[in-house]
Amino acid sequence: PLPASPVPAPGRGIDIAALVAAGLAEVERNERATAAARQQARPTLLERITRRHLRPAHLASVHIRRAAAVLATAGWCRGELTDASGRHCILGALQAVAAEADTALRSHVHIRAAMTDPAPYARPSGAYLARLDAEARAQGLDPADVRRRHDIAVANNIGQLTVGAVLELLERAAAIAESAGD
């Protein structure tokens, strides 16, 4: 799992210089990840002329990178798909980008493959998962699909602490998708 910051915490006491350095390193990490996400999803001249970048994505790597660009430009939030300011969570960004239905499902698979196991405090209880499955069945939904979406929501709301970490997760997922030919 990626640490929240590449700068380690001091062993004892409060080291103000180390805290400032860690904060600056995190800001730089966020800026690098944001710039990389924007650059990866920037359409080429040919794509702009043919408007290919506006068509639904048929490759999961393209879909994921477009979602990362949405997060990099509109902003990232927690707890809701899209907030009042227009910022998106991971699932909200995936929904905001046009993609074929099968592509969206494959994108979820690649994002889950890029995720690390959540910390114990972020894992829902067995009773909660049973209730989630029962509610999904009552609404005619596939419980396994609901759980997959739930895993991504947990990573967005609890597991990832910064926009840089979220964008790096999406870039890892896009790289996994590309290596799989998707």
Predicted feature residues:
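Extended, charge-enriched "interface" segments that sit outside catalytic cores
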Residues: 93
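Domain-length accessory/inserted modules outside core catalytic folds
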Residues: 1-87, 96-182
